[in-house]
Amino acid sequence: MPKTVLELPQHAGVSAARNRGAEAARGEILFFLDADVVLAPGGMRRVFATMSRPEVGALFGSYDADPDDVSIVSRFKNLAHHYFHQHSQLEATTFWGACGAVRRKCFFAAGGFDEKRFKLPSIEDVELGYRLNGGGVRIVLDPELQVKHLKKWNLASLVATDVVRRAIPWTLLWMEHGRVQTDLNFSYDQRFAAMVSFALLLAIPVALVNPYIWFVVGALLVVAYRLNRGLFRLLLTKGGLRLAIGGFLLQQLYYLYSMIGLAMGSAIYFFRAL
C-alpha cells in the first residue's frame, strides 16, 4: 500500500497531526491508527466492508487479548479495554482514534479533532465522537477489528493518565453536553461497581475496629466480583491467579481514582462557570 509521510514544521500535538493527515488524504474514508498499535491481519478488509455500508459514518475497533507488554499493570489495562469493547453496544456514541475510520465528509463537517483543546493525547477522539453523534452520524463498534497495543504501563503512568487526561476532561465533556454515555465502561453496572468500591474503602477501616463489619466487607467483595466476573475470568485465563487478583485490586483502584477525577472535573466546571 503506497504511503506518504508528512513532516510538520513544529510539534503541534496529536490533534493537529491527525488533522493535517486528514487534509492531505485523498480518499473518501479516513482511517486513524495510533503509532503504538499493530493492526491485525485482515483489518483493512473489515474497515472496507463496514464502511461500504452507506448508513455507517464512522467505526472503531478494539485492542486484542494479547498485549505486547506482559507486566500486570499493562496486561490489566489492555485486557480491560479489550473486554469492555468486546461486550459493549455495537451502536456507539463515541469514537476511538487508536483504530477508527470515519467518512471524510463527516469528519470535516464535524470540525475534525479539536487542536486547541487537545494538544496532548487525551480524549480528543471521544470529543470528536460526541460531535459526530450529535450531528446524526452513525458510529459502530466492530469488536473483530483489532489491534495489538505495544505501550508499556506502570502504576504511576496509569493513574496519572486516567485521572488527568481522561477522567477530568471526560467529566467536563459530559457537563458541557449535558449527557453521559451509557456504553463501554460507563454502563450502569459499572457505575454501581464504582459505588461498591467506594463502600469497600469505607468498610475496611471500620472492620479493623469492629470485626462484625468483616461480614459487610465479604459481601461487598462478592458483589464487586460479580459485577466484573467476565473481566476477571479473562484475566485468569490470560495470566493465571496472579493477574486475576492483581487485576481485581487494580480495578477497584481504577474506580476510586476515577471518582476523584470526576470530583475534580466537576469542581473545575463549576469554578469556570462563576
Tell what function each PLM region has:
Residues 8-25, 46:
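Glycine-rich, basic loop-to-helix element that forms the pyrophosphate-binding segment
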Residues 30:
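Short aromatic/hydrophobic "clamp" motif used to bind/position activated sugar donors
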Residues 26-27, 99-111:
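Conserved nucleotide-sugar donor-binding
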Residues 1-8:
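Acidic donor-binding segment of Leloir-type glycosyltransferases
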Residues 60-63, 75-94:
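Short, flexible, basic/aromatic active-site loop/helix in glycosyltransferases
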Residues 195-270:
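Membrane-embedded multi-pass helical conduit in multi-pass membrane proteins
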Residues 114-182:
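Catalytic donor/gating beta->alpha subdomain of glycosyltransferases that bind UDP-sugars
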Residues 38-73, 150:
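Conserved donor NDP-sugar-binding/catalytic core segment of glycosyltransferases
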